[in-house]
């Protein structure tokens, strides 16, 4: 994996993020073939949950790379670091890889996918309960604290990286997504409201980090 992945950095001097085809532990289910930014401003793993049938065998540019097995160019990390840190300590869990990718894109860096570099990832092995490992619909298996982190970190990522133009362009999609999400919270996960309110203190810091 390492040998193949590192070849990506010699293709273009502005490639700062490289990863390969990430499979689940069953070695046939795709976990990620590149990280992308969705219209509703969530992290989108290309190929997530699909069976590997050779549909992602073409290497090429991607928005970012999954943090499970990511290679980052040191020059890129040095250029995009915030307050001396590469990763935002306020995130705790989730969205760090999208935050890094979005920051890197704003600075003119690129991500690259190499399908010959194959790795295996136990999805949820760190954050989920044992019954949720390698299962879809991650939110179901998260503790309340981690679920709150997931929601909070999406907002922090948007605040830090979205341009004014991008905000208004994607506002309808984001508003629709948030309407559904908050409806779910109010109906089924009301216990998330308190930790989410406690997390609002991080918003001020995020606004200060806007590029």
Regions found by a protein language model. Give the residues of each.
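Alpha-helical elements of Rossmann-like donor-binding domains used by nucleotide-donor carbohydrate transfer enzymes
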Residues: 4-5, 99-103, 153, 178, ...
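A recurrent flexible, glycine/aromatic-enriched loop bordering the glycosyltransferase active site
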Residues: 29, 42, 50-75, 86, ...
């Amino acid at each position: 994996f390492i040998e193949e992945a590192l070849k990506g950095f010699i293709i273009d001097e502005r490639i700062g993020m490289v990863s390969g085809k990430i499979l689940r532990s069953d070695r046939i289910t795709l976990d990620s073939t590149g990280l992308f930014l969705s219209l509703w401003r969530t992290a989108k793993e290309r190929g997530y949950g699909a069976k590997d049938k050779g549909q992602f065998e073409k290497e090429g540019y991607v928005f970012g790379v999954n943090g499970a097995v990511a290679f980052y160019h040191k020059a890129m990390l040095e250029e995009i670091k915030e307050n001396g840190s590469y990763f935002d300590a306020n995130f705790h869990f989730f969205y760090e890889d999208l935050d890094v990718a979005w920051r890197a894109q704003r600075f003119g860096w690129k991500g690259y996918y190499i399908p010959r570099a194959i790795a295996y990832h136990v999805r949820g092995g760190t954050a989920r309960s044992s019954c949720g490992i390698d299962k879809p619909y991650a939110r179901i298996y998260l503790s309340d604290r981690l679920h709150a982190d997931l929601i909070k970190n999406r907002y922090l990522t948007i605040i830090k990286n979205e341009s004014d133009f991008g905000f208004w362009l994607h506002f309808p999609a984001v508003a629709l997504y948030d309407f559904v999400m908050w409806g779910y919270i109010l109906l089924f996960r009301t216990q998330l409201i308190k930790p989410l309110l406690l997390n609002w203190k991080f918003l001020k810091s995020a606004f200060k980090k806007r590029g």
